[in-house]
C-alpha cells in the first residue's frame, strides 16, 4: 500500500489517532481484497486521500498504471482539495444564485475535460493499432511535436492537455470529434535530442524508479482560497508503493523461470519517462497488451533477473540506454511451449475430474460434443467466471491459468448417464439446427472450393500451363523435399483443402498471390499419373501387399483360435464363432485388445491393426461366461471335452431345447430341405458339424442354398415382428399388416422407434442378413408410433378391400419363396386401385433416386481414384476406415452413407448439389486396392459392373449372386452384405 505524505491538505491537530487507525485498517482490508482479485486475474487501481495522506492501493498493474498517470494523481488530489474547500465555503456562507451557476459551470467544464481526455486516449490507442484506451503522453508529444500529429482540431487551437482548453473549445471538440485523429510518424526522441536545456534539466531531475521502490516527490499546485492558508507554492508529495506480493505468484508453472524481465518493463517502467521506445512499445501501457506480452515472459517480477538487455537498433538512430528501455521480440518457441504445457495440464485435469464423475479407474476420453449438445444434463461446475467448458485446445494462456488456479472447485455433473453411451455419429450434422450450422457448412464448402481452385491454378502455373490441373496432394506429402509449396501462412502446412477449417482457409485466400508451387523433380508427377490411371502396372506392390495382409490375417486368426481354446480349457486351437460373440457381448467377449480396436474377424482389419494385435497378443484373453452358447459351433470331439470339463449337465447341449438358446445364426445350419421339425431334431449332430460352415476361413465354398434359406426365414420373422408391433400400437392382440406406403408418405404421424442404429424403417424384403439380425436382436425396444389411428384404419380397410383374398398361411416360414417381396409388389401394382398406384409410384421414385445417387457416387469415386468411368463405391470400407476417403460437398445435415440408408429428401438434396460433391482419397485401404484390381480384370465385362452398381440399392444379396455366377474360385472372402 503506497502512502503519500502531503502538506497540501488542511490538517487538523485535533484529529484523533483512532480515526487514522480506522482508515489505515480499512485500507489494509481493501489491499487484501485487491490481492484476492488479482488471483482471479482482475486488475484494480485505487487512490485514497485522507487529510495529509494519500494511499495508492491495487494490483500490480493497477498500481503501475496509477503511478504512470501522475497527472491523474495530481488531478485527484486537486479535486479533493477543491471539493473540501467548496464544502467548507458552502458551509460557512450561503452561496448566491450567481455562485451556484458558477459551480455548475465548473462541474460542467470538469466533465467535458474528462470526456475530451478520454477521447484523446481512445484516438491515441487507435493510432497505435489498439481498440482500447491508451494514456496520451502529453509531455512527450509537446516536447517532440513532430513525432505525433493531431488532425481535426479547430484552426488556431494547438494540441495540449484538455485542462488548458476553455468551455467553448471543449464543446467544439466533442461536437466534431469524428474528424479528430492521431497520426504516429515516428518514435519519440531522447530529451537530449532537443535544444531546450530547461526540459533536459527537468527530466534529469526526475529519477527513474524501480517497480518496487518509492516514487519521487510529486509537485501538486493547489488553488488558494480565502480561508485556507495554502499559498501558490508547490506542495511536495511523496508516494510510496507497496512491495511486491510473492504469494500472488505462488502458482508455479513449469518453465516459468526461464525468461527475461521484459514483462516487468512493459507493466511498470514504460511510463517512467521512457522516451526511447518504439511505437509498438508504447502499447504496453495498455493493460490489454498483457495478453501478448505476458505470453512472452513467464516469471513473476520478484523472480526475474535484474539484468537489462540492450534493445535492437531502432529505425531512427538513437543512443542506446540499457538502463531505461526494454525492447524485445516475441518469443514464439517459449510461448508455444508454455501454452502446450498448460493445455496438457488442463486436459489431464478435465479427464481426471470426468473419471471421478463416472467412477472410472482407467484412462477416459471426454465427449466434448455431448457436453455442448446437452448443457442441462451434462455440465461442469467450478470453472472461473466467464470461462465456458470447451476443449483445452480452444483456450488461451490466461484462461488456462485461471482454470488451473480453480482446479479444486471444478466438478463434472452428469445427470443422465445414458447420454454418455451415445456414439460420435449422433453428434454429427445429421440433424443440424437451422441457420447457424447450415450457414457454416455453406461457408466452409465455398472456401474449400476457392482454395482448391487456387491450388489447381498455382500448380498449373508451376507446370507452365494456363489451364488449372488437379493437385496430387499425396505426392507432395510423400516427397516434401522435391515437391513443396512456398508462401503459405505461418504454421499452416500444405494439404488438401478438405483438411482445413475456416480460419486457415481464409488465411490462405488472403495470401493467395504469394503462394508458389515448387517442383524440383517433375518426373515424380508423371510417375504419379501413371500410378493412378494405370494401376495394373503396379501389380508387384499389390502382390506384396496381398501376401503381407494374408499372412497377418492368418497369424491373428491363429492367435484368436488358440486364445479361444484356452478360455474353454482345451489344448488344441478352435475356430472362433465371431457372430456368436457379436450377438452375446455380455457373456462372450475379449479383453486385452489394443486401444481402439474392437473384436472382429481378422478379415475386417487392415495391416496396421493386425500388426498391433500381433504385438499385443500376450495381453489378449477370451472370456466365455456361458459355454453353452458356443458348444454347438465346436467339432464333436471338442464339444464332448467341453461337456465333461466346463458344464455341470453333460446332456444339456445335445438336447433340442438347448439349441434354441443359440442365436438365430442357427438358421444358417438348417438346409433348405429340412421341411419338418422332426427332421431337424433327428439331425442335430449333423447340424453341429454344419454350423461351422459360415465361420470357416475365407476361400471355402459359399453355400447359396443355406444363405437363401436363412435370409428368407429372417425376412419372414421381421415381417411378423413388424405386424405384431403394429397391432400392439393399435391396442390389438392380433397382428396387423403394416402399410409401409403410409409410413413413407406421412413420417411425422407414423414412425417407428427403437430400431438399431443406422437401420431405417422399410419393408423387410429390402434388408440384408446383418440388418435383419440386428432388428430381431433389438425387437424388445421396437415400438410403432401411430398418431392418427383413424387415417391408419382407413388405409388398412382400403388396402384389404381392394386386394385379392388374403394370402396368409399357417405353413412353416421356410417354405416361402426367395423374392416374395418383389413379386408381391409386381402383383399389387396390377390389381390395386389408383390410390395404391400412387403409393407404389413413390416406392418406384425412391428406387430411381437411389439409382441416381448411386450412379453419382460411383462417378465421383471413379474420378477420385483416377478412373475415367464409374466405379462401385465400397461404402462399408469407407465407413470402417474413417479418414481414408473424405467426401466434401454433401448438403448440410446429410452425412455420407450408402443410398439404401438415405431418406428420399436427403437423396434429392444430394442430387441438387451434385456438382459440389467430391471424393478425396487421403490414404488407400485394402478394399480400395482390391476394388481397383477387380475393375481392371473385368474391364471387358462392363455390364457386370453396371449390374452390381445398380443392385447396391437393395444391399448385399444381388452383389453376392453376381459374384457367385463367376465361379466359386473367385470368392476369396466371406459374403459381405453391406459392402
Curated annotation (Swiss-Prot):
Record's subunit section: Homodimer (Potential). Interacts with SRF and PHOX1. Binds a pyrimidine-rich initiator (Inr) and a recognition site (E-box) for upstream stimulatory factor 1 (USF1). Associates with the PH domain of Bruton's tyrosine kinase (BTK). May be a component of a BHC histone deacetylase complex that contains HDAC1, HDAC2, HMG20B/BRAF35, KDM1A, RCOR1/CoREST, PHF21A/BHC80, ZMYM2, ZNF217, ZMYM3, GSE1 and GTF2I. Interacts with BTK and ARID3A. Interacts with isoform beta of PRKG1.
Family membership noted in the UniProt record: Belongs to the TFII-I family.
Segments for region (Disordered): 205-231, 250-325, 642-695, 797-818, 940-979
Predominant location category: cytoplasm
Tagged with keyword Transcription regulation: yes
Gene that specifies this protein: Gtf2i
Processing and modification events after translation: Transiently phosphorylated on tyrosine residues by BTK in response to B-cell receptor stimulation. Phosphorylation on Tyr-248 and Tyr-379, and perhaps, on Tyr-484 contributes to BTK-mediated transcriptional activation.
Protein localization: Cytoplasm; Nucleus
Function per UniProt: Interacts with the basal transcription machinery by coordinating the formation of a multiprotein complex at the C-FOS promoter, and linking specific signal responsive activator complexes. Promotes the formation of stable high-order complexes of SRF and PHOX1 and interacts cooperatively with PHOX1 to promote serum-inducible transcription of a reporter gene deriven by the C-FOS serum response element (SRE). Acts as a coregulator for USF1 by binding independently two promoter elements, a pyrimidine-rich initiator (Inr) and an upstream E-box.
GO CC, alphabetical: cytoplasm; nucleus
GO terms of molecular function: DNA binding; DNA-binding transcription activator activity, RNA polymerase II-specific; DNA-binding transcription factor activity; RNA polymerase II-specific DNA-binding transcription factor binding
UniProt-recorded name of the protein: General transcription factor II-I
